[in-house]
Amino acid sequence: MTLEATIVCLDNSEWMRNGDFTPSRSEAQKDAVNLICASKTQSNPESAVSIMSMAGKKPEVLVTLTQELSKILSGAQELKINGKIDFSTTMQIAQLALRHRQNNHQHPRIIAFVGSPLKETKEELIQLAKRLKKNGVAVDIINFGEVTENSDKLEAFINDVNNNDESHLLTVPPGPHILSDIILQSPIVESGSGQFGSEFINADTDPDLAMALKLSLEEEKQRQERERKAREEANGGSTNSGTTTTTAPTESNMDVNFEDDPELAEALALSMATDKMEVQSSTTNTDSQPPQQQQQPPTDDTSSEAFKDQDFLNSTLNSLPGVDPNRIKNALENLSKKDEDKDKDNEKK
């Protein structure tokens, strides 16, 4: 499944109290959110999900982009019903949050649940869609509840935001069906989530099974994450290239962040220049060491001259236990004669 950063926007307006979905629009939405978030996090361990509310005093980010399924589901459960939705403002806030995602390789996506009337006109939604498309943000919308009033507007919105069939509109009329089951078989939940099966558990009808499913999904995600980290550590420990690959994105991110602050950029450049000077200095010291080592031979010459001193030689040999000074003297004299003979032969040549 595609590596994505997904912001799920939830309708928490007063309209969500209606009971035309089982058991209510709000509860049906919660079940569907559980399905979508589990699908996104399980299909790719690097994908991240965020939760936003669309109603109340203002749209609000409840959970920032994260890969922790338990944190995502917990934030969705804390949603409070209040006021009317502000669809346009929600889309703009979500787009801004996606622009500042940490992993730029993640494809930005917004999934919005719309279960109450939209205050925006069709023209306003079209303009909003064009801005989202320009910034490469894909949008999926689940239109349920107020289908008659919102369908025309949302169809126009999706038509303008759609790029390479990456955006989708799912319209679900009220009825005895379960919202999450319909979403499960729609393009919004891609084939990578087929592991959940068509028998997705309703948390209200069977809470024990729903909790077991949630825990198993979380354990599977943690297992995949451990395997991924183990592979990265193995690759990084075996070769130096792995370390270089790991640190490179951090350096590039620093360059991007410093572009807006010339003083920080200058300080970074100066520090890098200082590091280079220190490296060059250490290299120069290393290169200068061999000449110092070459100066050691004169010390050897001095020691050889000392051995030519008879008094020094006698005192040294006499101080050594078990050593016959006369034998040592004879050996040294023989060596000296051989050296003299070699010198004479060289002079004749």
Curated annotation (Swiss-Prot):
Any single GO BP term: ubiquitin-dependent protein catabolic process
Organism of this sequence: Dictyostelium discoideum
GO molecular function, one term: polyubiquitin modification-dependent protein binding
Biased amino acid composition, Low complexity: 235-253, 280-301
Gene Ontology cellular component terms for the protein in this record: cytosol; nucleus; proteasome complex; proteasome regulatory particle, base subcomplex
Positions of the UIM domain: 204-223, 259-278
Function of the protein: Binds and presumably selects ubiquitin-conjugates for destruction.
UniProt entry keywords in alphabetical sequence: Proteasome, Repeat
Cited InterPro entries: PSMD4 (IPR027040), UIM_dom (IPR003903), VWF_A (IPR002035), vWFA_dom_sf (IPR036465)
SMART domains on file: UIM, VWA
Protein name, UniProt field: 26S proteasome non-ATPase regulatory subunit 4
